[in-house]
Amino acid sequence: MKYSILAILAHLLTNIKATQEVFTLSDLPPDSCPIDSPISCSKNAQELENVNSCCYESPAGVILLTQFWDYNPATGPDNLFTQHGLWGNMCSYGYPQFCDPSLEINPNGEIIRSIIVDQFGDEELYNNMSYSWKDYHGKDSSFWAHEYNKHGTCFSTIKPSCYLSNTPKNQNLYDFFRIAIGLFNKLPTYDWLAEAGIVPTNSKTYSLSEIQSALNDKFGANVFIKCDYNHAINEIWYYHHVKGSLLQHNFLPIDSVAHTNCPSTGIKYPPKGKVAHPTLTTKTTTGTSTTIHNPTGIPARSYVHLSGKSGCLISNGKWYTSGTCATYHFKKTIDDSNIEIRSSKGICGINGNEEFTCSRAVSGGTDFQIKDGKIGYQDKFDWCFGSTTGSGSTAQTSVKLADGSCDSFQLLI
């Protein structure tokens, strides 16, 4: 009988930690996979049409390890870029997501601890996740479940069909989190920046070239640096190809294919728990420029939930209970009086039906306020449900300003 390389590796790893035992391809049956496992996205891999994709990552062979710098609200240790996720991107363009509903777990993620700790006895892994893989709303388990359901179900080399028949149930889920944390621990972004003299501060800014040089030199390839609306460091993405199965941990750094949105100079790196102060430059009577700091006092980004309701707002501004929450971005207006809200769809505002909506067609959406974690519009903080499109799990419902005739709720960040 032929076994995939993944099946044998999983069998060897079932009751040991990856750091406790080393094995090589020579331990595996010679006819399981190519002797020299292909590198994902390489010409060699693309020509192996008849080779089981349990042997190498396909078609999503670009592997990203992504990290957050969540400074407001402060999330995770003060000296750590926290884990965002382990993602697989297509070799050409785009990325798969939610690839196999049969493998998904409950979005609350409560089962994850019992699988990792109770079933596999790996309390060390669970503790590492609790320390470094943080959700800025404090819902770590839900965040882990989201990352597994969206990305972990898409890796070809840890599909359940790749494992031996006597492999324990949930081995693929356990392997996803173990591999993600293992790679994360090899990419200490905070330490690499600190070694180059780049540390969190509100008293100075850094250039893009300084940050790139510090990280690229350590990683061995160009990394992707993402900034938020305040020109503060927000995320770091590390791109890889992988040789053979994910279980071999043979990740090969490659240059980022994404382009930074950070400015060439003036990049902020605020300490956690502090606000990245936007700067306004004005001319003094002597002709020199003066920098004025205006604290925003609001989070740079957040999900938007409804008080007393499940679900959240998606990027078009509608309420949805079955999909992924949208990340909303918040910025004080120049006069510091109101808030501009954006999603990936564009600026958010109130339409003619007094419904909250976000799109590129919206303009001048700066009449929002945030008070005690609640979103208001022109000092109105109560909202109601509006019209619904679709049905069942795909239904999307608009939210509108309350008029006193409905059961109202609040929009919470």
From Swiss-Prot:
Residues annotated as catalytic: H84, E147, H151
Principal location listed in the UniProt entry: other
This protein's UniProt keywords: Cytoplasm, Disulfide bond, Endonuclease, Glycoprotein, Hydrolase, Lyase, Nuclease, Signal, Vacuole
Residues the record marks as carrying a glycan: N128
Keyword Nuclease: yes
Annotated PROSITE patterns: RNASE_T2_2
UniProt family annotation: Belongs to the RNase T2 family.
Protein name as annotated: Ribonuclease T2-like 1-B
Organism of provenance: Candida albicans (strain SC5314 / ATCC MYA-2876)
Gene: RNY1-B
